[in-house]
Structure formats: structure tokens, C-alpha cells
């Protein structure tokens, strides 16, 4: 699948998901390439249909895009609930376990998700996998002692790589932390791994989102298809 085909599937999923947002809602808006198409469609609806809703974003990038369309964006602490959050995912398996954080927004994404009544992911078909882990697992760490955390991960065989930008500098999250990507190839015991990561001193959050999502909208060549989590 080339990039144009993949973008077409992402756009279709984003447009389908935008239908979930109705007047008066408080909606969480995620981060990433698929979410950009979602926000484009919501911006169109605001302009052409008079849609009025309030957004809570998981990154400054999404906030800037949404505000460019005139969408009202507020801080998460200014709302008492979030009706639905729509976000992307880097991988999702049949058990509705996912990896997120390819865009370095995993901490804000998880905070918004855990405060949402409903969580929806939008992905193209390449993101649906049998077993998660082929996509490197992002882990957000504080800069102080980051090298020591990397050494601990190396000793455990997690194959960590500090994420760098085009200038060779560590990528910074919106909270000014670093991201370490774990090249695991496959994750057979995600719950155990999640517990090990979050109890490592220096780790702020990890990109494992386990059985959190309620619904996945998949951009498919035959049209968007919906996967509902039977456990939710």
C-alpha cells in the first residue's frame, strides 16, 4: 500500500468518526496523521453545518489545527466530563490492546482517554495486527537519569532507543520529557510488561493502552468498518 492509498483510508476513517460528534458535546481530539483528517472534517462541519462542540486536545499540534478552524478548545481541568475521545493508534490487536505514542503524545493521550465516557480509535487497516509489538513501544521518561533507565531496559532485553529529532537532539514531549522506543517485535504478555514499565523509576508513562478502547473504526478499501470491543 502506497502513502496515497493509506492516506485515503485514514481520511475515510476520520470522516466516519466525525459523525460521532454532535452539538453540545465535549470531545477529546487525539494526535497523529489520521486525527488530522478527523479535525479537517470537523472543521468543515463547523463551517458548513454550524456544528458547535468543545474540544479537549491531546497535544498542542492538534490544538493549533482545531483552533484554526474556530473549534473551541479548553483545558482538560476546565471540564467535568468528556463525552467521547477520538484518537489514532499505532497498532491494535484482536483483544483491543493497542500501542500509541508514535507522535510522542502518549501521556496526554492517556490522561484524556481515562477521563472519557467513550474511547474511539481511527486507524487504517495496516494498524490492525494479530499481536502488538512490531511497532516500537514508546515510553516517556524524565530527562534526569534517562540514560540509566535506558541501561535498565537494555539489561532486560527491551532493545531501547532514545528517540532523536532531525538534528540529533532528543525528541521532547509536550511535558518536556524524552521518549525511549522499545523494539520488542512482539508483546505476548502486555499486562506484565505494562506493570514492569510503570514501576520503573524515571518512567512517566508507557504507550500500552490495554483494553481501554470501546470502538475501532478501520479505514478499509471496501469502506470504513467498525470493531466494537465486547468487553466494554
UniProtKB/Swiss-Prot annotation:
- Active site per database record: 109 (proton acceptor)
- Keywords in UniProt for this one? Isomerase
User: What EC number(s) is this enzyme filed under?
Assistant: 5.3.1.6
Is Nucleotide-binding one of the keywords?
Answer: no
Q: Which pathway is recorded for this entry?
A: Carbohydrate degradation; pentose phosphate pathway; D-ribose 5-phosphate from D-ribulose 5-phosphate (non-oxidative stage): step 1/1
Which Gene Ontology CC terms are recorded?
Answer: cytosol
* Coiled coil regions in record: none
What is this enzyme's class at the first EC digit?
isomerase
Record GO terms (molecular function): ribose-5-phosphate isomerase activity
Catalysed reaction(s) here are:
aldehydo-D-ribose 5-phosphate = D-ribulose 5-phosphate
Residues that, per the record, bind substrate: 31-34, 87-90, 100-103, 127
Q: Does the record carry Isomerase as a key word?
A: yes
Please name the GO terms of the biological process aspect recorded for this protein, alphabetically: D-ribose metabolic process; pentose-phosphate shunt, non-oxidative branch
Q: Which HAMAP family match?
A: Rib_5P_isom_A
Protein function: Catalyzes the reversible conversion of ribose-5-phosphate to ribulose 5-phosphate.
UniProt lists the family membership as follows: Belongs to the ribose 5-phosphate isomerase family.
PANTHER family, alphabetized = RIBOSE-5-PHOSPHATE ISOMERASE
| Assembly behavior | Homodimer.
* Name assigned to this protein: Ribose-5-phosphate isomerase A
Lineage runs: Bacteria, Bacillati, Actinomycetota, Actinomycetes, Bifidobacteriales
Amino acid at each position: 500500500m502506497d502513502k496515497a492509498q493509506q492516506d485515503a483510508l485514514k481520511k475515510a476513517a476520520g470522516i466516519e468518526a466525525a459523525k460521532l460528534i454532535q452539538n453540545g458535546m465535549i470531545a477529546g481530539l487525539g494526535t497523529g496523521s489520521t486525527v488530522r483528517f478527523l479535525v479537517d472534517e470537523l472543521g468543515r462541519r463547523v463551517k458548513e453545518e454550524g456544528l458547535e462542540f468543545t474540544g479537549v486536545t491531546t497535544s498542542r499540534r492538534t490544538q493549533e489545527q482545531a483552533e484554526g478552524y474556530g473549534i473551541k478548545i479548553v483545558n482538560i481541568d476546565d471540564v467535568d466530563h468528556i463525552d467521547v475521545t477520538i484518537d489514532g493508534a499505532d497498532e491494535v490487536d484482536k483483544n483491543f490492546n493497542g500501542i500509541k505514542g508514535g507522535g510522542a503524545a502518549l501521556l496526554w493521550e492517556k490522561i484524556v482517554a481515562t477521563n472519557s465516557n467513550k474511547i474511539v480509535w481511527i486507524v487504517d487497516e495496516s494498524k490492525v495486527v494479530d499481536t502488538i509489538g512490531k511497532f516500537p513501544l514508546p515510553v516517556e521518561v524524565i530527562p534526569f537519569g534517562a540514560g540509566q533507565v535506558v541501561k535498565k531496559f537494555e539489561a532486560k532485553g527491551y532493545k531501547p532507543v532514545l528517540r532523536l529529532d532531525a538534528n540529533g537532539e532528543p525528541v521532547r514531549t509536550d511535558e518536556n520529557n524524552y521518549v525511549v522506543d522499545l523494539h520488542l517485535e512482539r508483546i505476548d504478555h502486555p499486562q506484565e510488561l505494562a506493570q514492569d514499565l510503570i514501576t520503573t523509576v524515571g518512567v512517566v508513562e508507557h504507550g500500552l493502552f490495554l483494553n481501554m478502547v470501546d470502538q475501532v473504526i478501520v479505514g478499509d478499501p471496501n469502506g470504513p468498518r467498525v470493531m466494537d470491543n465486547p468487553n466494554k
